[in-house]
């Protein structure tokens, strides 16, 4: 019986000659690959005890579905209903319309990436964002590379390579993906000198550690965790005094970084870049796609003498930004010239600054959209996270719409909405399926309502 079924399985060319597949607009390479995979799957089914082969038309439909799935990009848009503004797995910051348009224009056209129009000669790609960064942070000079880990790697390689870097034990963070500050320091060709204890580091610890091989003092903002209780750390002003007294630079990895003060939005403990430099930090680095709300980038700002050395290091070319990212970054930074415009235009700031009343009203509008499609729900107050390793101990008061799953379990509803062509990624909390409105665009309400109704129906 099994042998007869194997003989009856159609050949690859036979299936490719079927009208259902011949008229398809799918790429021939994908079709052939899908035919082979479907036939392999069919053979496995026969070995597993399949009693009869499917009709050829059904087989062709499976092949087309498989080929169409292969054409879907793995990187695609999702609806973020988690309430986590800087969700690392969902791409962190969403670009403003201005930034997205600037990136698209740079991608489509030739540009002045490294061309000096005024003098008709080669220019520098650093010039496109340097003046803006200096204006916004108070730095003497600035540059940008492709992420903050790269920025730290480049800074230490250029300013401390072959020497010793002093850092507090309480600041030796893991920044994600198993990338740890001690390992980055070692990769730069530096020796790490750890001072103090996990919970307490004193001025005298730094002073006692400085020696002939010391090249820099490193401060790391512990943005993705907090040490509380019996603690002590040395303020930036004192660290700068110690470093400068020995002719050394003070370097700070700010992590998320912030151009504007976020305390009015209820986010505390995130120092602004300007505050860091004003305290005496010589070189600071921070991310572009976190609290700044721009594209992925590592921004380096500080004293001109150090920034120029960093620009000339061989690693700088390997870590440089492309034209689309530079265009998006310039557009994002430009919005910060007017704080009100920045909060209104940059999605990250708009989400983080949304008041509880605004979010409640937004949740009511989503609830109505769901009700219009026959989906029952209730409003739930939530504690939203900033995300991206920022303000880890703080929750922002928000609102969510909890969908009644009907005949489905909460997990089944979550899976159905997550496996859509445009996934809806939400939260399950206390056996409720929550659509947290802080991170949902209003223009997605109708799609969410239709998808929920279809899933529950």
What are these regions (language model features)?
Residues 74-75, 142, 286, 422-427:
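A short linear hydrophobic-aromatic micro-motif
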Residues 119-336, 451:
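Conserved PLP-enzyme active-site core in the AAT-like
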